[in-house]
């Protein structure tokens, strides 16, 4: 509400502030200043102060030209500079304070005035920059006086123009308000110019913003592209570095392999050379001995024998030492082979155990998955059954409601028929009585005496019996049972007979698929169990229907909750199935990775062994399958019996995985040590290799041939290994298939043999139980039939009494409900009237508040205008006083100068130098001007 006037006032104010620009445009290239701008007022005050100072202090000095203060003053000392800065700061503070107060007062006003102020502002604003034409202070003062006179004249004219000459009553009579409104309308050209200007500014601003956004987008895009290029370059660089590193690693591996092969070759060659040398030495020594023995003298035979004996002893000793050394080496080699065999056996048993464990887990997951699928299928079937039952229940409820409505309609129809019959009988009796009275009045009664006597008797007979017959004959057709084959639904008992027993019986029998005569009998028999209860007699159709609906609603809610629970269970089972599938996939992938790792380790181990051990390792690998089937058979037998029995000794032994991990750690440490030794040897052998390069060139051809042979042997060995592995896999698969077959046979025996037999036994028991129940029900029905007939007769008698009582209660309740309805209508009318009155009052109050706000805004605008005029008047008055004060000061200064001249002429020359004298004069004048300004 209050935002619109403020917006209008702000727009008016902006228009009023910018209206002077149209009138102050001059063809001169000089810049124009607004009267409200701070720079304009600062410059104005600076010029005025400069003129005042120049006129006050430099009248004597004819040598200096009259120019502005900034060009005249030659500040030579720091004291002068400080004084000048202080004076300038004080003057600027005064101007800033005055401008702040003016701006605050202008901003506080909400609107700038109507058309009254527009004329004055238009006349005053064009002359705002008139002071810039004057360079002398006297001319400026004259201009200000003329401006003040023109403002006073304009004020007086405005006052005369806006003075109310005629009373408000006469103005209303003459219709002058419309003319005033027309006069107060503003010039539309100003608003159009302002709007055009605003549109141009907005367009320029929008174009700048769009340009800025476009530049930002281009910069962002370029930065993003640069970053993307840098990232791609970084990725390429990293990929190249990784590729180079891999290539270097491959080269190093090739170098290491070549060095190992060359070292083996050199060792073998050295062994061969040593053997040849030993054989040659032994042959030479034997030849020498045989040659010398022929030339030995008999005296020297003893010496020769001793030498031979000593030589034999030495040979025996060397042979023993060699044999011991060989035995020691062979024992170490045998121990290493045995350890290797033990490790291989452990690894094989561990891998077999892992495979069997994985198979068992996979089988367990598969069985669990099958079980979950069966459970989900059963749950889905249950849900379908529940849905079917729910549909049946809703259909049965709908039929019950229709039956109930039909019985109500039958009641109403019977009552209407009774009323019509009663009305007809009354009309007939009335006509007969009229005829009898007419005959009596005409005197025909004596002639027709017998007929006249008989007429009243017949009338009385006709009045009484029709009512009774109407009650007796019209009511029974409503309670007659409809034929079973005529309609699909049975008519429920009437409205008066609906009891809690009936409702309970109907709700209990909802699940039965074919409601026939049995249901009719139970529905009729259950009310007879409570013949003396008054509560069952008072239950009406209005109570019975909500009960039935309430039971059905609760049941429906329960079924919905059960369905939601089953859906949640289904979702959980599906999640578990997915998790089991993922576990199976992970287990298969892990098994494949472990198998590949074992194969690569075996290959690397075989490649690292020396050539001397190749035939022995081949024999071991050939013999290992012979031992492995036994171990595999034992492990399979153990795993097959592990599901039934567990030996206690197995629990005491440590886990094979831990042993394998410890052995692998030891192997890794040994490999590291061997690699460190190899590196040292490589560094030592590099020097030797440089010397032996020439010899190696000649031997390369032979070595290449040997390498080819070795490759062929290795390929054959690998083929044998692969064949052995295939045989092992085939055996394992056969064993696993046998275990799976046994398990399948067991499951078939359990599922197809025992469980169907159990189900057959249970079905037979259930059939016997159902037959016994059926027989008991048949006996009950047979012997209770007579009792049921008698109870039905008593029930019919009681139901007639209940119907009569029910009709009385129904009349009372109808009257009470009608009275309550009338009271509620009156209350609603009263509330509506109160609401309408409140709305009307609040609307009137709202209009009054709005008018008061508009009046207050107008008064506030008038007050703001008055304050602006008063401030302007005060400023002009101060300027006028300031001019007078400056003139008086000039006169006083001239007198002082005259007195000083006279004193100087009389007295000797004791005066201070010129610049100190000037500073003294400046300080005096500025102190006087400051005190005058503060006082004013």
UniProtKB/Swiss-Prot annotation:
Question: Where are the coiled-coil regions?
Answer: 189-270, 364-440, 554-592, 662-739
Q: Does the keyword Coiled coil apply?
A: yes
Q: Where are the transmembrane segments?
A: none
Ranges where the record places region Disordered: 495-541, 607-656, 691-714
Q: Which keywords does UniProt give here?
A: Coiled coil
Compositional bias segments (type: Polar residues): 497-516, 527-541
PANTHER family referenced in this protein's UniProt entry, alphabetically: COILED-COIL DOMAIN-CONTAINING PROTEIN 191, SFI1 SPINDLE BODY DOMAIN-CONTAINING PROTEIN-RELATED
Q: What is this protein called?
A: Coiled-coil domain-containing protein 191
Q: Which gene encodes it?
A: CCDC191
């Amino acid at each position: 509400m209050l935002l619109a006037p403020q917006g209008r006032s702000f727009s008016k104010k902006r228009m009023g502030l910018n209206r002077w620009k149209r009138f102050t445009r001059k063809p001169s290239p000089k810049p124009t200043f607004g009267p409200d701008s701070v720079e304009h007022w600062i410059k104005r005050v600076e010029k005025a102060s400069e003129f005042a100072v120049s006129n006050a202090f430099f009248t004597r000095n004819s040598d200096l030209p009259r120019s502005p203060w900034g060009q005249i003053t030659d500040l030579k000392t720091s004291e002068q500079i400080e004084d000048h800065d202080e004076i300038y700061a004080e003057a600027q503070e005064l101007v800033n304070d005055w401008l702040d107060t003016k701006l605050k007062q202008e901003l506080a006003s909400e609107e700038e005035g109507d058309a009254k102020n527009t004329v004055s502002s238009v006349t005053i604003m064009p002359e705002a920059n008139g002071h810039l034409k004057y360079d002398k202070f006297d001319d400026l003062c004259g201009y200000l006086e003329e401006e003040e006179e023109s403002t006073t004249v304009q004020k007086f004219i405005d006052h005369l123009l806006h003075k109310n000459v005629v009373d408000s009553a006469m103005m209303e009579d003459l219709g002058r308000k419309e003319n005033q409104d027309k006069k107060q309308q503003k010039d539309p050209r100003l608003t159009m110019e302002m709007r055009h200007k605003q549109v141009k500014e907005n367009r320029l601003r929008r174009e700048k913003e769009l340009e800025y956004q476009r530049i930002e987008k281009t910069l962002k895009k370029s930065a993003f592209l640069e970053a993307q290029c840098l990232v791609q370059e970084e990725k390429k660089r990293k990929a190249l570095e990784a590729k180079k590193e891999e290539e270097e690693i491959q080269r190093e591996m090739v170098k290491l392999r070549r060095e190992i092969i060359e070292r083996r070759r050199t060792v073998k060659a050295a062994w061969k050379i040593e053997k040849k040398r030993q054989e040659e030495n032994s042959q030479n020594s034997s030849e020498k001995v045989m040659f010398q023995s022929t030339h030995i003298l008999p005296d020297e035979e003893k010496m020769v024998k001793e030498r031979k004996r000593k030589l034999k002893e030495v040979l025996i000793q060397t042979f023993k030492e060699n044999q011991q050394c060989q035995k020691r080496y062979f024992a170490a080699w045998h121990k290493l082979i045995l350890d290797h065999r033990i490790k291989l056996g452990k690894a094989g048993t561990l891998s077999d155990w892992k495979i069997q464990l994985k198979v068992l887990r996979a089988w367990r997951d598969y069985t669990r998955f099958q079980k979950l699928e069966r459970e989900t299928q059963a749950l889905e079937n249950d849900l379908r059954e529940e849905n079917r039952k729910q549909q049946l229940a809703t259909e049965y409820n709908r039929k019950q409601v229709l039956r109930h409505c039909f019985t109500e309609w039958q009641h109403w129809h019977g009552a209407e028929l009774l009323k019509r019959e009663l009305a007809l009988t009354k009309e007939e009796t009335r006509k007969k009585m009229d005829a009898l009275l007419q005959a009596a009045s005409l005197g025909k009664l004596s002639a027709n005496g017998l007929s006249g006597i008989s007429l009243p008797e017949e009338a009385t007979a006709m009045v009484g019996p029709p009512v009774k017959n109407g009650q007796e004959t019209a009511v029974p057709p409503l309670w007659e049972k409809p034929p079973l084959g005529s309609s699909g639904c049975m008519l429920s008992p009437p409205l008066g007979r609906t009891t809690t027993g009936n409702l309970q019986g109907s709700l209990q029998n909802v699940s039965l698929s074919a409601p026939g005569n049995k249901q009719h009998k139970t529905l009729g028999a259950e009310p007879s169990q409570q013949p003396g209860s008054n509560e069952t007699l008072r239950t009406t159709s209005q109570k019975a229907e909500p009960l039935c609906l309430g039971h059905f609603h609760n049941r429906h809610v329960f079924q919905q909750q059960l369905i939601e629970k089953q859906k949640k269970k289904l979702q959980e089972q599906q999640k578990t199935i997915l998790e089991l599938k993922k576990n199976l996939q992970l287990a298969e992938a892990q098994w494949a990775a472990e198998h590949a790792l074992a194969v690569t380790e075996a290959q690397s181990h075989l490649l690292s062994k020396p050539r001397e051990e190749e035939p022995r390792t081949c024999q071991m690998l050939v013999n290992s399958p012979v031992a492995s089937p036994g171990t595999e058979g034992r492990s399979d037998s153990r795993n097959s019996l592990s599901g039934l029995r567990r030996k206690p000794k197995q629990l005491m032994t440590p886990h094979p995985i831990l042993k394998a991990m410890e052995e692998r750690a030891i192997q890794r440490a040994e490999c590291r040590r061997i690699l460190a030794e190899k590196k040292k040897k490589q560094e030592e052998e590099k020097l030797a290799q440089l010397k032996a390069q020439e010899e190696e060139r000649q031997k390369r051809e032979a070595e290449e041939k040997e390498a080819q042979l070795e490759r062929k042997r290795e390929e054959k060995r690998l083929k044998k290994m692969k064949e052995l592995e295939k045989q092992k896999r085939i055996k394992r698969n056969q064993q696993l298939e046998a275990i799976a077959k046994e398990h399948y046979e067991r499951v078939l025996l359990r599922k197809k043999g025992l469980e169907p037999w159990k189900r057959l036994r249970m079905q037979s028991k259930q059939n016997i139980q159902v037959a016994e129940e059926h027989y008991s029900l048949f006996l009950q029905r047979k012997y209770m039939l007579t009792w049921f007939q008698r109870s039905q007769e008593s029930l019919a008698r009681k139901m007639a009494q209940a119907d009569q009582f029910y009709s009385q209660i129904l009349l009372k309740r109808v009257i009470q409900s009608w009275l309550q309805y009338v009271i509620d209508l009156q209350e609603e009318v009263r509330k509506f009237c109160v609401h309408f009155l409140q709305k009307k009052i609040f609307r009137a109050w709202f209009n009054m508040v709005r008018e008061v706000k508009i009046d207050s805004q107008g008064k506030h605008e008038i007050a703001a205008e008055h304050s602006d005029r008063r401030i302007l008047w005060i400023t002009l008055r101060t300027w006028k006083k300031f001019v007078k004060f400056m003139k008086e000061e000039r006169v006083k200064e001239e007198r002082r100068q005259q007195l000083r001249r006279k004193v100087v002429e009389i007295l000797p020359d004791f005066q201070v130098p010129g610049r100190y004298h000037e500073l003294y004069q400046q300080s005096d004048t500025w102190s006087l001007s400051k005190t005058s300004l503060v006082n004013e």
